[in-house]
Each structure stands twice: as C-alpha cells, then as structure tokens.
Amino acid sequence: MKYIKKLIYVLLLTVATQVATAQIKILYGPYLQNVKENEATIVWVADKPSIGWVELAPNDGTHYYGEERPKYFDTTNGVKNTSLLHAVKVKALTPGTTYRYRIYSQEVLSHEGINVIYGRVAACLLYTSPSPRDTR
C-alpha cells in the first residue's frame, strides 16, 4: 500500500510539474482586420493570459532581424492589456508600402497593482502584408 501511495505521489508531482512549465502558444492568427490606406489592426489569440505586441518593418529588402524593429503593444489608455485575445492597431502606415510583421505574446504569471511578473514569450513566423496591388 505504501508503494502505491508513493507511486501516485510521484505521478501527481510529475504531472503538476509538466502543467506548470507548459509553454505559452499562439493558437490563432495573426489576422489583418480593418485594413485602411494608412492603418491596420492585427488580431491573434494566445492560450494563456499575456501581453501582446507587433513588430513591424517595411519590406525594403533589408534583413528583418538586422536591427531592432518598432514595437506596437496591445494597450488601453497606455496600459498593456493582459488577455488571451490581442488586437493591435498600427497607424501611420505609408500608402502603397508592403510591410513585414511578427506577433508576440508574453505570459503574465502575476499582476498585482504595478507589480507584474512575466513568463515566457511566444512568437509567430514572419509575415508579409499583401501587396497594395493585390488588395484592389
């Protein structure tokens, strides 16, 4: 009987450890929404409460990872949203320009007042926006 209790304890401990260390994932997206001449909204869903952002660059032939790209966060009144669903509106886009973008979600492990503890980051592959000629 003692052996069975120990076996169950070890099994439960193993399962609990696996659940606690499961990595955050992007489940759906990115989706381009409300695309206009100089703005677009990028939407995606993560599997854990997280903050989200988009990194964006024009498709100008430079290496995307050769320099740091601007980050556009999912915010409300300047505060980063903690959510499963992320929507980032990117403004001031140059008409006629094709862009490359990548979405990110960073898990929020704890958020008490101004104290936030972040976890792991999930990111998608690099996407390229449709050519302006293809959207007419």
Residue ranges of predicted features:
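Bacterial Sec-dependent N-terminal signal peptides
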Residues: M1-K25
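Residues at beta-strand starts and edge strands
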Residues: Y9, N38-A40, S50, L84, ...
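Non-catalytic, glycine-rich low-complexity segments
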Residues: Q23-I51
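Short beta-strand segments enriched for Tyr within beta-sheet-rich domains
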Residues: W44, V54, G96-S105
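Aromatic- and glycine-rich beta-strand/loop motifs that create alpha-glucan
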Residues: W53-L93, G113
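Residue-level signal for short segments within beta-strands and strand-turn junctions
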Residues: L56-D60, S105-E107, P130
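Single conserved hydrophobic/aromatic residue that forms the stacking wall/gate
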Residues: Y127-R136
